[in-house]
Structures are given as structure tokens and as C-alpha cells.
Amino acid sequence: MAKAKFERSKPHVNIGTIGHVDHGKTTLTAAITTVLAKAGGAEARGYDQIDAAPEERERGITISTAHVEYETETRHYAHVDCPGHADYVKNMITGAAQMDGGILVVSAADGPMPQTREHILLSRQVGVPYIVVFLNKCDMVDDEELLELVEMEVRDLLSEYGFPGDDIPVIKGSALKALQGEADWEAKIIELMAEVDAYIPTPERETDKPFLMPVEDVFSITGRGTVATGRVERGIVKVGDVVEIIGLAEENASTTVTGVEMFRKLLDQAQAGDNIGALLRGVAREDIQRGQVLAKSGSVKAHAKFKAEVFVLSKEEGGRHTPFFANYRPQFYFRTTDVTGIIQLPEGTEMVMPGDNIEMTIELIAPIAIEEGTKFSIREGGRTVGYGVVATIVE
């Protein structure tokens, strides 16, 4: 049979393997590519090729991540696998690897372990919306009742963190046996991917989301009005749209976009990814500033207090050399601006060491346009000392 051409026309989904160390995440990743390669949907990648993940220096932090791609009959997937636990924490908090869904790998021989719990919590905090479970190493467990027990444990754990534990697909297999080409176990990999296809929805495209553009610069054009420039983060903006100016002010201002310009050309509309200048009706030069956002009316609000999942850079990564304590007041960099904020640590936590990851409550001195999942960095005098993601809005 001739190899099917690698089509780009299929919907694209980003997924990743998560779970405890040595439960078989990387072996499963290798097994998926190897099994799908037989149907022409992937390039087979061995365990060693994936395990030797290159270290990526993403914004000064070192993250080891393996990226593989493959396709099923209906979709094209980009799949990330991280060798170390710290790599997951960094990856998920900085959004270096955005996941539309995760495959949670749990060894049937060991059951859920500390990092199983941690990765589920992390997925919840950073907004990985869907999880499918692969119970691995089932060839090592003869007792059917034991398998059912482990499955129940995993489902309970998922429910505990707000995932629909009872409804999540759980596939029992053996990544190693599938990798070695045993047909019965290969079938389990096919079954896993069929569940991933069916259970993890195709993400909404950036252009289908409500319009949002962080303001980078503002200038006035004599006789025309005020122009805000920036890169459209999501959605589409058309001439004539009513938008809100959000953040750094007591209340949102509303205005109409009377012109959209890109590379000095006038456009009817701009979309996610475009760098534009938006001409705003009736807005004075001093009514809008860098750090605010332009957004579709009612789509996003300004908030000052929120809970966040944060990881603090180690000394080696260019971070602080000393711990910080409650009431620490660094700058929080959201999109295009720094805002000072005060940190509250969880009960029982006295201090945070460089290299830690922790949930904290942050109160900014001025409200800013944020939502659950908004990423930020923590800075001191222009130097980045940590990264975070908004987990829940408090007020």
C-alpha cells in the first residue's frame, strides 16, 4: 500500500503525556508513533530518540521537551513529552507547551503516585481541559480485580481535582509490548487514540475567540484621532466594531474602531497574529496607555486579586539568590506592562525558595485584564524571577 501523504488539512490538536516518573510516558509516546507509523500516520520514533529530549532555553529557563507529531484518520497531533517532573511544571506554567488535552499514564503495577496527583492538580490549575487515562504495564498484572481497583483509584483522584472522573476514558494496555509489536497490545494503542480522537474536542481556533489586543503603544494623528498599536492576541476586529479599553483604570471605556492599519495599509479587518494600529473614535491620547487591552465588549474584565500557580526561578536560572516571604512586593508583568502586587502565601508556608513551585494569592495595586489561564512573569527591577499562570479570580 502506498504511504498516505502527510496532509495538513486535518484539524490540529496539541496533546501531551503526563504522569509519575517511570510509569511509561516516554515508552507510550514511542509506542503511539510506532503503531501509527504502520498506517502511514507517523514517523516511528524509538524510546531513545524521545528520551534524549533537547533542552530548550525558553526565555532563559531550561526546559527539556520532546516534540513528536503524528496523525490519526481524523486529526493531526502535536505531542509533547517531558523527561523530568520540573520540566512539566515549567512547561505548563509558562505555556511553552500548550495542551488541549493530556494522556495521563499510570502504571497498573504501582497505581497512582505523588506526581500522578501533582500533574492532575497542575492540569487543573493551568487549564488543561481534558484528560484520557492510559493504565500502563497491564501485562505485569494478572489480577483483574487489582486492575479495577487501580482504575477506581485514578478515577477518584481525577474527580477530587474537578475532572469528570466517572466519564473519563480509561484504556488498559502495555506500551512496551505494543512497542515490541505484539498485536493485542498494539490494538490497545489504536483504542487509546480512538478515545483521544473522540473525547478531546478540537480546540476553538484563535480567530473564533472574542477579540483582544494588548496595547503596546499609543500616538495621536492630527485630524484623525488616537491610534493604539499592538499584536492581536485572539479573535477578529473589523472597522466599525465597538470595543472596550480595559485595565489600569477605575472603569472600562467604550469606543468604536474607525480604522485598522497594518504595514501602513488600511484594512477592513485584522485577526489573531496581526500587528496593527487601531484608530479609536473619541479617545484622547491620555485616555489610553500601554498595558491596557482593547477587547470585544463584555468579553474580559479587569481584576486585581487572584490565585496563581507560580514557579520561582532558581539562582542558576538567573533568579533570586534568597527566599522571599509573605507581603513580598515584586512587579507582575502581564502582556505589555509591569504592575506592582502583594503576595500572600498559603497557610503554613513561611517562605518561598528559589526553584520552588507554589500556589499563591496576588493582589495588584491596579486592576488589569485577566482571565483564568492568563500567563505572567514576576520581575524585580526588570529582571525575571518567576513565572505564573492565573488559576482562579478572587475579585
From Swiss-Prot:
Residues given in the record as GTP binding sites: 19-26, 81-85, 136-139
Signal peptide feature range: none
Enzyme class of the recorded protein, top EC level: hydrolase
Domain of life where this protein originates: Bacteria
InterPro entries in UniProt: EF-Tu_GTP-bd, EF-Tu_GTPase, EFTu-like_2, EFTU_2, G_TR_CS, P-loop_NTPase, Small_GTP-bd, T_Tr_GTP-bd_dom
One BP term from GO: translational elongation
GO molecular function: GTP binding; GTPase activity; translation elongation factor activity
Reaction equation(s) it catalyzes: GTP + H2O = GDP + phosphate + H(+)
Region of interest (G1), residue spans: 19-26
Record-listed E.C. numbers: 3.6.5.3
A matching Pfam family: GTP_EFTU_D2
One Gene Ontology CC term in the entry: cytoplasm
Location of the region described as G2 in the Swiss-Prot/TrEMBL record: 60-64
Region (G4): 136-139
Keywords, in A-Z order: Cytoplasm, Elongation factor, GTP-binding, Hydrolase, Magnesium, Metal-binding, Nucleotide-binding, Protein biosynthesis
Role summary: GTP hydrolase that promotes the GTP-dependent binding of aminoacyl-tRNA to the A-site of ribosomes during protein biosynthesis.
Binding partners and assembly: Monomer.
Protein's name in the database: Elongation factor Tu
